[in-house]
Amino acid sequence: AEMAVRASLTGHKVYSTIHTRDPREVYFRLEDMKVEKYLIRDSLVGIVSQRLIRLLCDNCKTIIDEKNIDGKVIKLYEKCGCNECNFTGYKGRSLVAAIHVIDNEMKEKIKNINNDNSLLSNLEMIKNLKALLINGNISLLDYENFIEVEGLSFEFKKESKL
């Protein structure tokens, strides 16, 4: 890990995959790998956090409720099952992602990452997930399960309330 960080500091582009539950853990994982904090801050230029979620089959999804979300009445769907989706209720997947650009301002903020849970959070992923729900691409149950399975902290659950 330290060799990759040092290579990035000499101008080489280094891409790596670190499997973590959220972008904050990337920073802490590099610390656990004995990379100095100042080297982490100086070498990171971005973190992409991504997950896949199953999409409801447009052919058979069923309306179960209507709710007022952000001033708009939206239809909530649940999976059903048909020949087109092989009776699963799902057809295809969508990417739910967040991109964190580590600019000079963020590098300064990262110095206090232990005291600020909002830094490098998955909140952007929740906003993207909410858009899929509002557009009728996923069910409310899948939305809630995603939040639960991803282990998002309480603050982000509050933000995601419908």
PLM segments and residue spans:
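Short, flexible helix-loop junctions that flank or precede catalytic/ligand sites
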Residues: A1-L162
